[in-house]
């Protein structure tokens, strides 16, 4: 087993803070990196060492050569990529491997295979994992041929960037006349965000549940899952609330999906922490969607129901430790819910709301956890993802977990900037959420009700906003008919 004495965290904000705390628990030195706008971010303040990687807000976090250079210069044994930025960049993992630095994640070739959704689909189908009916990459085909593919699959269809993720590079098409514009738009976005304009097509599963299984595998072929998470509460393909385990699915279905998730991970020779994502339709048919070859934003709810620290497990597996858990050891207890609190203005179509935080009082109490990087007087920069904090609740039942979530959100104070806290409270008040009736259309379907229940602390013209959004939603529905 390799000894890890110092870890560089190639990331920022909340996930960097999370990894630094795991390092402290293991008595491992932590190294933060930052760009100039992040100089006052919490991860920089609490790390044992911190190094600036540039003045540009984003570019430094994507500079493979510079990050590896700093890791070597400071004597880091390993690099943890977090999520986002370079976390699923196989060239970064390969650069670490070539430099003799432990990459805390899967091997570079696995990241490469699973990072291309088209390749991943083929691999899963070859190994008997159910996939959504669809095509290979479409870029070499004419538009007339693409229209024929769509007709054979049947509308609605969804166009996806092969190298995509995070809700980018996705277009849902309900009728043929919209296909060409959607295809060109999807290609442009894919090229901008992923430097790869490959696009493929799938049958669009209408209003599915988005269910993912947490995978953990060591370097010796031992792979298990740590139960599932329901990530169906989304807005524009971005997760808003996650729940573990999934309310309202049978034990038999849960077992079948879990076995399939492990088989999918074994098919690619997976190591470390990862996630197999499925779509579940109204008939309990499930389909492989993608694999995330990194730690997930929502990993804390799995930790809460299993008692397993995933970041510590990542580090130990990367150091060569044998996984001392079997599938029969994993027995979830209770329910956990995570709500992502973001700096967004609900009343202006969720535009980012950066600025200086005034009073800051995170929620407290039994079985309440907050993972965050913010503090009183911290200035939220405009350059990054708008997430401020993750509020994680644990309870013995789903009903009690929802009650606790509502209470904790009401106690959570972040002053002087707009946040989604009131909107999240509104979600907890809906009958469908409380009953566990969840699917990916939840927020869109209930948007008018949610806005009516959202407390407007800044006293904007709420009625006009709701009316405008209702009219927009009506137009969207009519365009699909």
Tell me the role of every PLM-derived stretch.
Residues 1-126, 139-148, 464, 469-480:
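ATP-binding N-terminal substructure of ATP-dependent carboxylate-amine bond-forming enzymes
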Residues 2-26, 30, 50-51, 72-74, ...:
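ATP-dependent carboxylate activation and anion-phosphoryl transfer catalytic cores
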Residues 117-119, 164-168, 334:
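Conserved A3 ("GATE") glycine/threonine-rich loop of ANL adenylate-forming enzymes
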Residues 134-135:
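Conserved beta3 strand of the protein kinase N-lobe
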Residues 148-158:
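Acidic/histidine-enriched active-site and ligand-binding environments that engage anionic O-linkages
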Residues 161:
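N-terminal nucleotide-binding beta1-loop-alpha1 segment
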Residues 171:
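Glycine/aspartate-rich loop-and-adjacent alpha/beta segment that forms the canonical ThDP
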């Amino acid at each position: 087993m390799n000894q890890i004495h110092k870890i560089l965290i190639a990331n920022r904000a909340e996930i960097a803070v999370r990894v630094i705390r795991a390092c402290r628990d293991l008595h491992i030195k932590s190294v933060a990196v930052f760009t100039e706008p992040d100089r006052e971010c919490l991860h920089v303040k609490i790390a044992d060492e911190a190094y600036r990687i540039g003045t540009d807000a984003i570019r430094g976090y994507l500079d493979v050569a510079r990050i590896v250079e700093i890791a070597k210069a400071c004597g880091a044994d390993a690099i943890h990529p977090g999520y986002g930025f370079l976390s699923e960049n196989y060239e970064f993992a390969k650069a670490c491997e070539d430099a003799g630095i432990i990459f805390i994640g899967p091997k570079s070739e696995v990241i490469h295979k699973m990072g291309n959704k088209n390749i991943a689909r083929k691999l899963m189908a070859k190994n008997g994992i159910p996939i959504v009916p669809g095509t290979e990459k479409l870029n070499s085909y004419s538009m007339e041929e693409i229209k024929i593919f769509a007709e054979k699959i049947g509308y609605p269809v969804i166009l996806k960037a092969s190298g995509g993720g995070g809700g980018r590079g996705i277009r849902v098409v309900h009728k043929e006349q919209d296909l060409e514009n959607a295809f060109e738009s999807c290609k442009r976005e894919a090229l901008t965000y992923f430097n790869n304009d490959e696009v493929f097509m799938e049958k669009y599963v209408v209003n599915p549940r988005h269910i993912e299984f947490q995978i953990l595998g060591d370097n010796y072929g031992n792979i298990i899952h740590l139960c599932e998470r329901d990530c169906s509460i989304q807005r524009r393909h971005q997760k808003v609330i996650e729940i573990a385990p999934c309310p309202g699915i049978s034990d038999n279905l849960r077992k079948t999906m879990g076995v399939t998730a492990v088989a999918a991970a074994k098919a690619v020779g997976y190591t470390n922490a990862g996630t197999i994502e499925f779509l579940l339709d109204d008939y309990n048919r499930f389909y492989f969607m993608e694999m995330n070859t990194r730690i997930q934003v929502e990993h804390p709810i799995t930790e809460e129901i299993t008692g397993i620290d995933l970041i510590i497990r990542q580090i130990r597996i990367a150091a060569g430790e044998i996984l001392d858990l079997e599938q029969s050891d994993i027995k979830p207890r209770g329910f956990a819910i995570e709500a992502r609190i973001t700096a967004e203005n609900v009343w202006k179509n969720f535009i980012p709301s950066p600025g200086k935080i005034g009073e800051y009082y995170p929620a407290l109490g039994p079985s309440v956890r907050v993972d965050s990087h913010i503090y009183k007087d911290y200035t939220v920069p405009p350059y990054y993802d708008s997430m401020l904090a993750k509020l994680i609740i644990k309870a013995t039942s789903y009903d009690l977990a929802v009650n606790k979530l509502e209470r904790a959100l009401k106690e959570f104070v972040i002053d002087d900037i707009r946040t989604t806290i009131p909107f999240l409270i509104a979600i907890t008040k809906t009958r469908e959420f409380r009953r566990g009736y969840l699917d990916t259309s939840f927020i869109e379907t209930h948007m008018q009700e949610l806005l009516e229940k959202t407390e407007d602390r800044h006293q904007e013209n709420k009625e006009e906003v709701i009316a405008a959004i209702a009219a927009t939603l009506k137009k969207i529905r009519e365009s699909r008919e």
